Amino acid sequence: MEILMTVSKLASICTMGANASALEKEIGPEQFPVNEHYFGLVNFGNTCYCNSVLQALYFCRPFREKVLAYKSQPRKKESLLTCLADLFHSIATQKKKVGVIPPKKFITRLRKENELFDNYMQQDAHEFLNYLLNTIADILQEERKQEKQNGRLPNGNIDSENNSTPDPTWVHEIFQGTLTNETRCLTCETISSKDEDFLDLSVDVEQNTSITHCLRGFSNTETLCSEYKYYCEECRSKQEAHKRMKVKKLPMILALHLKRFKYMDQLHRYTKLSYRVVFPLELRLFNTSGDATNPDRMYDLVAVVVHCGSGPNRGHYIAIVKSHDFWLLFDDDIVEKIDAQAIEEFYGLTSDISKNSESGYILFYQSRD
């Protein structure tokens, strides 16, 4: 039995090596970007949800640079962030250009910290992304809090203990945008607004549409009437009103989550909406508020987490990323170069929403400024 397992492992390693050398040949020595590395990640039992998100984040350059900079700081106690920094550093400092790395330390820490991921079942990539970004932000804020209490900040100042609002971290600098919820009373025309921060936007999907259309739908005007009337402070009573959500501040990296999993009452479970949703290589949002800080911001698609299968707890996740001027597909330990036109294969299906499909699930757009 042990001999068979050894032979199996050797065969797997040989296959990985063949894939790696084929990738190098396909890119070519002259075209291969300087100081860039393309490494697949070993799957530790349904950890493709994690691998795909990590690959997408690695190719969000501002995020990668901050994680690598964190690695160079004085050694901190082990956390999910130190494990991520070790993994990114390991990829970035490899002698080889292509290959495979086991993210074992990161996966072990993830399973230790959150029981949701402490099993060998398929998990939701969006839930993992959300957990990872919020956990990193919490770690950074706690470290800054400790520095304040010790009276030593990076700028050498001693900060006030009275400031109860956590400082924004580089996670917020990269991913955080602001929505403004505008409500207009239909009686007195008074407009009230409330701001809400986000690290990613979840948008509803429809058949044969585009991400631009989905984002417009995100800002559709909703009428509040009947039992859902709005309490107007000016009128001092409940009134009919119009409510809509607009983007007040666009983030450096816009993470868009397509809500492809819907609970079906008749099935008593979630099923996948494999709708065809076109996502362009370039994007500009038109649902910004009148006082938006950067309404004309242009974005380029840099990564997509793709769900393959028919449901949230079944199937597989892969990532497609843009590196310099070409696209790569990361499928756990396999890395392949693909044509830009091949991205159209991940838009979804034009019919039979419950059929297995490879469809874009999380989109990462990076701003040009």
UniProtKB/Swiss-Prot annotation:
Catalytic residues (positions): C48, H316
Keywords: Cell membrane, Cytoplasm, Hydrolase, Membrane, Metal-binding, Nucleus, Protease, Thiol protease, Ubl conjugation pathway, Zinc
Record-given protein name: Ubiquitin carboxyl-terminal hydrolase 12
Subunit structure: Interacts with WDR48. Interacts with WDR20; this interaction promotes translocation of the USP12 complex to the plasma membrane. Component of the USP12/WDR20/WDR48 deubiquitinating complex. Component of the USP12/WDR20/WDR48 deubiquitinating complex. Interacts with PHLPP1. Interacts with RBPJ. Interacts with CBP; this interaction blocks the acetyltransferase activity of CREBBP.
ATP-binding keyword on record: no
Entry similarity comment: Belongs to the peptidase C19 family. USP12/USP46 subfamily.
EC number: 3.4.19.12
Coarse class of the protein's main subcellular location: nucleus
Residues the record lists as binding Zn(2+): C185, C188, C232, C235
Intervals of motif Required for plasma membrane localization of USP12/WDR20: 1-4
Catalytic activity field: Thiol-dependent hydrolysis of ester, thioester, amide, peptide and isopeptide bonds formed by the C-terminal Gly of ubiquitin (a 76-residue protein attached to proteins as an intracellular targeting signal)
Highest taxon above the source species: Eukaryota
Pfam families: UCH
PANTHER family listed in its UniProt record: UBIQUITIN CARBOXYL-TERMINAL HYDROLASE, UBIQUITIN CARBOXYL-TERMINAL HYDROLASE 12
Region (Disordered): 145-165
Domain USP residues, every copy: 39-368
Any one of the GO BP annotations: regulation of protein stability
A GO CC annotation given for this chain: cytoplasm
Keyword RNA-binding: no
Function as written in the Swiss-Prot or TrEMBL entry: Deubiquitinating enzyme that plays various roles in the regulation of the immune response and inflammation. During TCR engagement and activation, translocates into the cytoplasm and deubiquitinates its substrates LAT and TRAT1 and prevents their lysosome-dependent degradation to stabilize the TCR signaling complex at the plasma membrane. Plays an essential role in the selective LPS-induced macrophage response through the activation of NF-kappa-B pathway. In addition, promotes that antiviral immune response through targeting DNA sensor IFI16 to inhibit its proteasome-dependent degradation.
Enzyme class: hydrolase
Compartments where found: Nucleus; Cytoplasm; Cell membrane
Activity control summary: Activated by interaction with WDR20, WDR48 and DMWD through different allosteric mechanisms.
